[in-house]
């Protein structure tokens, strides 16, 4: 056992290529609340992320039960987009419970966030009886929507 305790989850972070576009999706489409948007001191960020010349703008958005950090790097040059698949080591995604998965898919499509396939019925696990779909945005960020089973 460690000599420290994890007190809570602070946030999940995604690096994005266009902070305005990502904020429009998370706030205007998904209904997140913008908590803060601001640049960070480049010297500080360079020390934190160990990338010489790093320069970023950060936004925090809040949904019920979870906060996201969205980071747009303005420097250094030569940045690239990750193209990982769910089967690749290091792949990450975030999952949100929704009350209507079809409406979530339609709203996401209107913002260019597309499903990887049709929603699927869950026949096992903690969400058995619900429905699930993976979506992907223009930056390759995967967002999973889960419609929990109806309460009887």
Positions of the model-derived regions?
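A cross-kingdom feature marking solvent-exposed beta-strand/loop segments within repeated
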Residues: 40-47, 77-84, 118-127, 131
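Long, charged/polar, surface-exposed segments that mediate recognition or autoinhibition
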Residues: 82-87, 106
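Core segments of cupin and vicinal oxygen chelate
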Residues: 15-65, 103, 110, 128
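Exposed loop/turn and edge beta-strand positions of beta-sandwich/beta-sheet ligand-binding modules
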Residues: 8, 55, 90, 129
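Vicinal oxygen chelate
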Residues: 2-5, 14, 37, 96-152
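Short, structured motif recognition centered on aromatic/hydrophobic residues
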Residues: 9, 16, 61, 68-71, ...
């Amino acid at each position: 056992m460690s000599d420290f305790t994890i007190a809570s989850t602070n946030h999940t972070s995604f690096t994005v290529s266009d902070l305005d576009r990502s904020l429009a999706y998370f706030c205007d489409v998904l209904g997140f609340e913008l908590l803060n948007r601001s640049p960070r001191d480049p010297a500080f960020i360079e020390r934190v992320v160990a990338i010489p010349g790093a320069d970023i703008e950060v936004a925090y958005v809040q949904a019920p039960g979870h906060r996201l950090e969205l980071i747009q790097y303005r420097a250094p040059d030569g940045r690239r987009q990750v193209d990982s698949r769910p089967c690749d080591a290091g792949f990450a995604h975030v999952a949100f419970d929704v009350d209507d998965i079809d409406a979530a898919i339609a709203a996401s499509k209107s913002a260019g966030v597309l499903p990887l396939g049709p929603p699927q019925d869950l026949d096992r696990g903690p969400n058995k009886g619900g429905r699930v779909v993976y979506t992907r945005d223009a930056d390759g960020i995967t967002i999973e929507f889960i419609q929990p089973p109806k309460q009887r």
